[in-house]
């Protein structure tokens, strides 16, 4: 399976809220980097390994209801994949609805995701936390 297909499958599973299934093609030592100021989001920082990545995603799911998860554009760069994603969310604690736009950069090696780097609107994130 090509890297772009692996990432597309992950996004579909995540959109379907199959969080564990979304990570099926992640290496055990996958690195997830969420680029942000940790003072703005408790989810910012780096997760090392599939279990930490899963824990981070489950924590997000506890804080937010994901109403729609839309990969707007996915760019195939061979073993590198870039994507713009639009996430329609509700903060569970406040009921506030918003749309978070993210840029994700994936690295795939030997059919497994080994790294994901995510950038997002930090000002928006700070306003909803």
Task: Mark where each language-model region is.
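Short, low-complexity N-terminal intrinsically disordered segments enriched in polar/charged residues
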Residues: 1-28
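Short, flexible active-site loop motifs that bind/organize anionic cofactors or intermediates
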Residues: 9-12, 43, 115
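C-terminal ligand-sensing/allosteric alpha-helical core of TetR-family HTH transcriptional regulators
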Residues: 6, 53-56, 83
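A beta-strand edge to alpha-helix "cap/lid" segment located at domain peripheries
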Residues: 59-129
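A solvent-exposed, acidic/Ser-Thr-rich amphipathic alpha-helical stretch
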Residues: 21, 27-78
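A short, structure-level motif marking secondary-structure boundaries and short turns
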Residues: 3-4, 42, 88
């Amino acid at each position: 399976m090509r890297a772009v297909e692996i990432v597309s499958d992950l996004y579909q599973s995540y959109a379907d809220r199959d969080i564990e299934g979304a990570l099926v093609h992640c290496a055990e030592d996958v690195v997830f980097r969420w680029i942000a100021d940790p003072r703005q989001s408790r989810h910012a920082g780096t997760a090392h390994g599939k279990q930490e990545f899963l824990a981070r995603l489950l924590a997000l799911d506890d804080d937010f209801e994901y109403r729609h998860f839309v990969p707007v554009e996915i760019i195939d760069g061979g073993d590198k994949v870039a994507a713009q994603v639009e996430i329609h969310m509700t903060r569970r604690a406040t009921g506030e609805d918003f749309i978070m736009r993210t840029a994700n950069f994936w690295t795939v090696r030997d059919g497994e995701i080994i790294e994901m780097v995510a950038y997002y609107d930090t000002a928006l994130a700070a306003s909803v936390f």
